[in-house]
């Protein structure tokens, strides 16, 4: 075909992984002999390996969730894929995926010796809906707990703010959050309106309103967390970058 009539293969609930030039090349796509297109994508702060029919139709999940994957290599003849994936309690490693079954196995263990001596922060994921907030969006949050967390104690809280504003926090091992949590801080990572991977309406909600409703989303998340008995509302900090 001459390409004049392109077909849309995914809805706006899936953000294809496009790379971040010039830091990394875009992820590969594989057009299978049976008409499937295999690609890496992101949805609600999680990475997945998807397949979509080339003639259009619903995308299906092959593998993923609860991770951030930033690379993809495909072997169509073998029916296998290899991705680089990071999990909330584990830095990135290579994982091999069977495209027919979705079964996976880890291929590398570069950080095992380090992680055996350093306990990772535990992540809790939850959502809030800001009372009276514009558009009624659910705001997804990730709270990281210090290793050895004791709910009978009281901990300072650091709010982490991502850039963009169309960036996002993922189910991933983030060094800055791990360092802060290991130092004894609770770390709150919020994806306010304007963040990617939650659909076009959510991402575009900050157009012409930077620092408006998105700021109120962040503050509502802090207000929600400081109600917990183990959070010291008098010791709050903020960390972030870019935006």
Task: Please give the residue ranges for each predicted region.
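Beta-strand C-termini and the immediately following turn/loop, strongest in propeller blades
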Residues: 1, 28-44, 53, 75, ...
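Multi-bladed beta-propeller domains
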Residues: 1-27, 42, 51-70, 99-124, ...
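Beta-propeller blade termini and top-face loops
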Residues: 8-14, 36, 42-49, 93, ...
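Phosphate-binding glycine-rich loops and adjacent basic patches that engage nucleotide phosphates
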Residues: 11-15, 33-38, 56-59, 179-190, ...
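Intrinsic disorder/low-structure terminal segments
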Residues: 16-19, 38, 62, 136, ...
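Serine-hydrolase catalytic core recognition
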Residues: 70-243
């Amino acid at each position: 075909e001459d390409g004049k009539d392109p077909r849309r293969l995914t809805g706006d609930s899936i953000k294809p992984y496009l790379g971040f030039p010039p830091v990394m090349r875009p992820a590969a796509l594989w057009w299978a002999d049976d008409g499937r297109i295999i690609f890496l994508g992101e949805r609600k702060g999680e990475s997945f390996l998807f397949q979509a029919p080339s003639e259009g139709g619903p995308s299906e999940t092959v593998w993923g969730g609860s991770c951030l994957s930033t690379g993809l290599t495909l072997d169509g003849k073998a029916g296998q894929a290899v991705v680089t994936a990071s999990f909330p309690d584990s830095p990135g490693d290579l994982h091999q995926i069977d495209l027919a079954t979705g079964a996976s196995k880890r291929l590398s263990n570069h950080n095992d010796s380090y992680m055996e001596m350093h306990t990772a922060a535990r992540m809790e994921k939850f959502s809030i809906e800001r009372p009276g907030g514009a558009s009624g969006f659910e705001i997804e949050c990730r709270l990281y707990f210090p290793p050895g967390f004791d709910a009978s104690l009281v901990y300072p809280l650091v709010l982490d703010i991502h850039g963009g504003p169309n960036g996002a926090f993922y189910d991933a091992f983030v060094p800055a959050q791990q360092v802060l949590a290991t130092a004894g801080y609770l770390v709150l990572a919020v994806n306010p309106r304007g963040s990617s991977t939650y659909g076009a309406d959510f991402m575009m909600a900050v157009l012409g309103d930077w620092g408006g409703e998105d700021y109120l989303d962040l503050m509502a998340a802090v207000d929600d967390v400081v109600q917990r008995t183990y959070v010291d509302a008098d010791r709050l900090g903020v960390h972030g970058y870019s935006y």
